[in-house]
């Protein structure tokens, strides 16, 4: 007879079978020699529901017999001031000192 500690607890799978998709590897031909290149095509509203809206950048990890797609979070938009400072970093040392002096004057005049 088994003890309480040796009975496996039921668990839910990480991915529901209703969320699984079945794809077939097709091919795309490459000009000029029309070489067949393996290709996967994915489309459907389920992509957006899964976090892959149009324009989403995707990280692709490839392993033997396995491809993992991960939607990347959009980077927050950089402020106009930060963009200007990034451009100022590309200026000559003399011009950078002028920018620093200007910022010091502006910061001091509250």
Curated annotation (Swiss-Prot):
Keyword Phosphoprotein in record: no
Entry GO terms, CC: cytoplasm
GO MF assignments: DNA binding; RNA binding; RNA endonuclease activity
Any one biological process term the GO annotation gives: RNA metabolic process
Domain of life: Bacteria
Compartmental location: Cytoplasm
Domain SpoVT-AbrB: 29-74
Keyword presence, Cytoplasm: yes
Pfam families: SymE_toxin
InterPro entries found in the cross-reference section: SpoVT-AbrB_dom, Toxin_SymE-like, TypeI_TA_SymE
EC number: 3.1.-.-
Alphabetical keyword list: Cytoplasm, DNA-binding, Endonuclease, Hydrolase, Nuclease, RNA-binding
Family: Belongs to the SymE family.
Protein task: Involved in the degradation and recycling of damaged RNA. It is itself a target for degradation by the ATP-dependent protease Lon.
Name of this chain's protein: Endoribonuclease SymE
């Amino acid at each position: 007879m088994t003890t309480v500690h040796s009975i496996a607890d039921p668990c839910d799978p990480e991915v529901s079978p209703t969320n699984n998709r079945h794809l077939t590897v097709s091919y795309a031909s490459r000009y000029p020699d029309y070489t067949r290149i393996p290709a996967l095509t994915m489309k459907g509203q389920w992509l957006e529901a899964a976090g892959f809206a149009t324009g989403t950048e995707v990280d692709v990890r490839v392993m033997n017999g396995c491809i993992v797609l991960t939607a990347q979070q959009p980077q927050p938009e950089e402020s106009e001031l930060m963009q200007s400072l990034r451009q100022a970093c590309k200026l000559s040392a003399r011009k950078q000192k002028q920018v620093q002096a200007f910022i010091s004057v502006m910061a001091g005049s509250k």
